[in-house]
Amino acid sequence: MSVIKMTDLDLAGKRVFIRADLNVPVKEGKVTSDARIKATIPTLKLALEKGAKVMVTSHLGRPTEGEFKPEDSLQPVVDYLKGAGFNVRLAQDYLNGVEVNEGEIVVLENVRVNKGEKKNDPELSKKYAALCDVFVMDAFGTAHRAQASTYGVAEFAPVACAGPLLAAELEALGKALKEPQRPMLAIVGGSKVSTKLTVLDSLSKIADQLIVGGGIANTFIAAEGHNVGKSLYEADLIPEAQRLSKVTNIPVPVDVRVGTEFSETALSTEKSVADVSGEESIFDIGDKSAEQLADIIRNAKTILWNGPVGVFEFPNFRKGTEIVSNAIAEATANGAFSIAGGGDTLAAIDLFGIKDKISYISTGGGAFLEFVEGKVLPAVEILEKRANG
């Protein structure tokens, strides 16, 4: 099914309500990481170029519905946009209508302060819809939530469409999952098999090769009968790890880096996976394992990456993730299509300076994983319904 795209619409003189993801970290009234705002700026510029009367909104943090507090305000985002050269102002009371002039952007205050937002209240949804001629959903990061500003408004707005950012996410994920160039490789890291089990299941059916990292890999190591000492792993999920290993090719580390404490000053010792003692914890893969994975990565034509292979935040347990990251960048330079998503993955990409060497970096955490699992994203589903009558 297809969606209407904002890029295809005539927006001249139209009131356009953009639901963006401007949920950025703020300290002492200043934005401390601007990645999400920067990702939204091309959408705002395009709407202005098309002659629209532009309103944009987002959630920020976790406010209590019906109780506005200054720390929940989108004012720091407004200040940032002013600094970027936009004619922009904040509207706090907007549910009964707001005046928007051509050439300006009106930021509508934090949607999660509005009563009924999270429960997708129809009355609130209708109020949002009444503000606009065109609703633009451009927040992939919240597309897995059916809320008034992501789903309800799309039911009632005269026109509901996908913004450039959302459209690009869907296209990139579709390219990786629906028609991947072979061989397709999926890299899934993280602390627990239990939180990624459905992702691993779905990917085992699509990918030619699956790489697991972090605490997930420890469960697979234990499933092979090795001692994992005090490592984070899930004994009750060993049968699941064994089942998945039969379905698809999952390489288990042959060597690891261990420590006796979880800290950046802990002594890091490299050893065979068969030699881990009862007092040690596995915090990274060893050089042999990292190079084996790098070889697999370099031969892949499609790479989906979610999660590191070790505790890369600590310099003493960083090497495995660094080797894997650089191999993904190398494969991409040689023509592979790579897509990365998830907070830890993005932090690793920043740390190793490979942002421009990945084909597509997803802005969604939970939404990215749910899409990979094959779940229907409510905010996308309603756009498809509206586009197809």
From Swiss-Prot:
Q: Which organism is it from?
A: Histophilus somni (strain 2336) (Haemophilus somnus)
Keyword list, A-Z: ATP-binding, Cytoplasm, Glycolysis, Kinase, Nucleotide-binding, Transferase
| Catalytic reaction equation(s) | (2R)-3-phosphoglycerate + ATP = (2R)-3-phospho-glyceroyl phosphate + ADP
Q: Does this UniProt record's set of keywords contain Magnesium? A: no
| Major place of residence | cytoplasm
Which family is this sequence assigned to?
A: Belongs to the phosphoglycerate kinase family.
Cellular-component GO terms for this entry: cytosol
Q: What is this protein called?
A: Phosphoglycerate kinase
> Which Gene Ontology molecular-function terms are recorded?
ADP binding; ATP binding; phosphoglycerate kinase activity
Gene from which this protein is expressed: pgk
Residues reported in the UniProt entry to bind ATP: K196, E313, G342, G343, D344, T345
Q: Nucleotide-binding: present as a keyword of the record?
A: yes
Domain of life, source organism: Bacteria
